[in-house]
């Protein structure tokens, strides 16, 4: 109930929570009242599954016919992947040509070519893909006055929560005209920053989207930095990434057991709980074992965090039946009531992306006489975690990973200067 009330209060006060723009900020962005017409735009296009499969087997010298046969063996449709690629490519071209017709200087880049220099060059960034591409585009933007706009290039296959409404996929010039006329408002999506300290830490990030890397190669990417590790650092180090959706902390490869015999070595992967200590809002430290810890923003409250915490109508019905038995409540539990209660609870898990607060969730906590979980989820302004793990990672927006093993300490906070500038077009 308290969670519902907090969300109700936050919704009622949403307008007051918008980050204010000063005079210099308005001048830097040419505020929405004046319209926004960027001279240079970087369009970041996603890598489709078809392109990925081509890149993956290019080194093997496979022809298109051989690739088609290989995909069929894997249960994938070559024609289907090619069709989605063509749809995406046509919509990307629609975006690029619409911008160029307006005299905008456009730079079209893929994931591997998207870097800090491209971000500095551009007045605005457009992600052409889905939510994953939007997260990628946002990941390299540190300037809170550089807008990032998402366009869903394949609405049939991508939800696109972070993108413009679907109709602008095919009518992008209409979206541009609304920007030029100032028919929109800036939306400042709060992001999470991370301070890492402790012993044996590694500040080198690994890009998890480099899908050409095998699992073994991924480990080598981490281990190749061992020589650069410091046994301890003098103080907290601010990591060079910001989380738009969430930060997840947990064991990555569980436990691995190698067996040697006359046969080739093989590996078993068994589940290992994540062991850590946690402090919420500078409160007392608490030892926990769980399947990991998720800390999200208002933007991320609709994503993984929502699916971790949401309740099914079946669970709600069972709980209400127990309450009715113990409290002698004379309440009709028809399907409509159950569904309304379910929706009310699940809706309370989602909050405004502009609110400067986080929501943490402990996944499947273990509770016994040694380990406890006094609070499994809740809103917070600061979370500190001390790792007691052996093979753990701290993953930012599902795309960037940092080692987070025994002795490492992370402080998870928000800062207004990290807010990501996006737009909400007027209806």
From Swiss-Prot:
It is found in: Mitochondrion. One of its GO terms (molecular function) is ATP binding. The keyword NAD applies. Pfam families: NAD_kinase. InterPro entries: ATP-NAD_kinase_N (IPR017438), ATP-NAD_kinase_PpnK-typ_C (IPR017437), NAD/diacylglycerol_kinase_sf (IPR016064), NADK (IPR002504), NADK2_mit (IPR012355). It catalyses: NAD(+) + ATP = ADP + NADP(+) + H(+). GO terms for cellular component: mitochondrion. GO terms for biological process: NAD metabolic process; NADP biosynthetic process. Its EC number is 2.7.1.23. Keywords: ATP-binding, Kinase, Mitochondrion, NAD, NADP, Nucleotide-binding, Transferase, Transit peptide. Its main location: mitochondrion. Gene3D superfamilies: Probable inorganic polyphosphate/atp-NAD kinase, domain 1, Probable inorganic polyphosphate/atp-NAD kinase, domain 2. Residues 1-33 form a transit peptide. Homodimer. Belongs to the NAD kinase family. Mitochondrial NAD(+) kinase that phosphorylates NAD(+) to yield NADP(+). Can use both ATP or inorganic polyphosphate as the phosphoryl donor. This is NAD kinase 2, mitochondrial. It comes from Xenopus tropicalis (Western clawed frog). The gene is nadk2.
């Amino acid at each position: 109930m308290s969670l519902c009330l907090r969300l109700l209060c936050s919704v009622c006060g949403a307008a007051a929570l918008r980050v204010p723009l000063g005079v210099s900020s308005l001048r830097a962005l040419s505020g929405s009242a004046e319209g926004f017409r960027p001279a240079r735009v970087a369009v970041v296009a996603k890598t489709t599954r078809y392109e990925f499969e081509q890149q993956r087997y290019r080194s093997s010298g496979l022809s298109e016919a051989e690739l088609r046969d290989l995909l069929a063996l894997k249960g994938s449709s070559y024609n289907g992947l090619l069709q989605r690629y063509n749809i995406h490519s046509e919509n990307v071209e629609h975006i690029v040509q619409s911008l160029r017709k307006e005299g905008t200087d456009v730079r079209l880049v893929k994931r591997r070519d998207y870097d800090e220099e491209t971000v500095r060059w551009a007045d605005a960034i457009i992600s052409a893909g889905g939510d994953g591409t939007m997260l990628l585009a946002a990941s390299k933007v540190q300037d809170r006055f550089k807008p990032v706009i998402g366009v869903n290039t394949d609405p049939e296959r991508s939800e696109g929560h972070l993108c413009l409404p679907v109709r602008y996929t095919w009518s992008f010039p209409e979206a541009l005209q609304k920007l030029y006329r100032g028919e929109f408002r800036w939306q400042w999506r709060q992001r999470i920053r991370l301070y890492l300290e402790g012993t044996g830490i590694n500040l080198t990030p690994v890009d998890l989207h480099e899908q050409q890397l095998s699992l073994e190669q991924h480990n080598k990417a981490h281990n190749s930095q061992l020589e650069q590790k410091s046994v301890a650092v003098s103080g907290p180090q601010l990591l060079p990434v910001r989380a738009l959706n969430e930060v997840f902390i947990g064991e990555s490869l569980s436990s691995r057991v190698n067996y040697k015999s006359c046969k080739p070595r093989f590996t078993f992967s068994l589940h290992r709980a994540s062991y850590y200590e946690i402090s919420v809002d500078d409160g007392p430290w608490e030892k926990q074992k769980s399947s990991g810890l998720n800390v999200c923003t208002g933007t991320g409250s609709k994503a993984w965090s929502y699916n971790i915490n949401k309740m099914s109508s079946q669970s709600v019905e069972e709980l209400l039946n127990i309450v009715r038995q113990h409290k002698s409540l004379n309440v009709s539990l028809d399907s409509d009531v159950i569904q309304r209660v379910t929706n009310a609870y699940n809706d309370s898990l989602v909050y405004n992306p502009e609110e400067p607060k986080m929501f943490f969730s402990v996944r499947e906590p273990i509770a016994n006489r040694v380990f406890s979980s006094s609070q499994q989820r809740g809103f917070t302004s600061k979370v500190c975690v001390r790792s007691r793990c052996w093979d753990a990672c701290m993953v930012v927006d599902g795309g960037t990973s940092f080692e987070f093993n025994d002795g490492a300490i992370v402080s998870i906070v928000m800062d207004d200067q990290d807010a990501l500038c996006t737009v909400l077009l007027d209806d």
